[in-house]
Amino acid sequence: MRLVIAEKPSVAAALAAALGVKNKKDGYMEGGGYLISWCVGHLVELAEAAAYREQYKKWSYDSLPILPQPWQYTVFKDKQKQFKILKDLMRRSDVSEVVNACDAGREGELIFRLVYHAAGCDKPFSRLWISSMEDSAIKKGFAELKPGKDYNALYASALCRAKADWIIGINATRLFSVLHGKTLNVGRVQTPTLKMLADRDAAITSFKKETYHIVRLDVGGAEAASARISDAADAEALKTACEASQAVCISGRGERKNEQPPRLFDLTDLQREANRIYGYTAKQTLDLAQALYEKRLLTYPRTDSQFLTDDMGNTAVHIAALLVGKLPFMKGAAFTPDIARTLDSKKVSDHHAIIPTMELAKADLAALPESERNILTLAGARLLFAAAEPHVFDAVTAVFSCADTEFTAKGKTVLCDGWKELERRYRATLKGKPNAEGDEENELILDVPTFTEGQSFDSPAARVTAHDTQPPKPHTEASLLLAMERAGSADTDPDAERRGLGTPATRAA
């Protein structure tokens, strides 16, 4: 008999359905040579400080630091029934093997191992490692179970993280709370993130607005702008001088540019985009993606990869075809996917990028809750964008001299809309949601004429525009996630496996 332990009941039910296990018991299912049960999140956790010494019940400066040796573990009261069920199942004489089917990631590994050790189990165990809850993926995963020992390092890293969080959280929280006479929570990820927010708030508070002016010349239907001028009188004087002078092109160049499609979503990128477009918090996005994963409509969400493995090409082509037929904004679009640009096994870590699954073929999108449908559509749209052609344009930059001052005209001529055409179609369905962020002052003007060196314009029309410098924007969840992802990058070894503050999943907490 093989005992399969999932992370939660809904996942256990999906595994049972795929394996044909139908006989329901109290806290588990049985049939076809399988026992399938589940944890309820973290069944076994690191014990509270008071478990080590009675004196630790009271927060005091003299009791610090608290450094457990050896570490103790506990099962909280509300989870003891399910833990006992798992423990009894592990000890059944007909159980010869245990399968860790908790989420295929660091925390899932920790959840299983702590239960396994706390139950005193020494039976051999293997690892189910899948990126989709589709029946085909589950069956393939069980046919290719990995030896449990292959994930010993992952377990060690998870346990190290948990102990580090405990030591920092318990000791630093108690220290600062005692010193300041009120509860001040300190955390390994929480506190540096709070510092980012405080720094941004301080920058906004201390910001002093400055007004600047730009003189703009009409040169053959295009507009050439001066550098910033702080004094309004100087700007007006330059305007007057230009209108009595000649604007001469001193350099004009065009450059063919390709703007590559965006990469597929990892969790952090999905959270940022969902926050910017729909206002969802990072946790809401993770919860919605997890729900879609458990409904078999989305691949595993807790990933930091933005590519698919090389062997997923055919599957991705089929999914793209499904999306073209399912997503309303693709109606009438001319689209031939180039899936190859999304494939790179060398850039895939534990799990590939987030994409919809083949279950999309049977799904009634209209029947999904709106928030889940939004996330599924967002992930599907990103797959189509990523597989579309580059956005190709000629960028034109012309510099003019007028009244001993340089003016610059910039523009672009679009040659191939590529993925941006699909993005425009998608955004047109969002009903008032924000467009892509841009810098209004430096935005390229479409179809600027080509200028040649020496070309001149007599007495060009000129105008002065006034602008105010802008304070830093308050962090949104989207910008904060990006700041966390990039935190410390300049000081991190280029060969480091991971950078930034927290993991994609912990940033959602």
Question: Whereabouts are the PLM-identified features?
Answer:
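Hydrophobic (often cysteine-bearing) scaffold residues that line and stabilize catalytic clefts
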Residues: 11, 107-111, 156, 160, ...
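Long, highly charged, low-complexity internal segments
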Residues: 35, 43-77, 88, 181-290, ...
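Short glycine-centered, acidic/aromatic-flanked micro-motifs in structured strand/loop junctions
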Residues: 102, 272, 302
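Intrinsically disordered, low-complexity regulatory segments
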Residues: 1-162, 166, 471
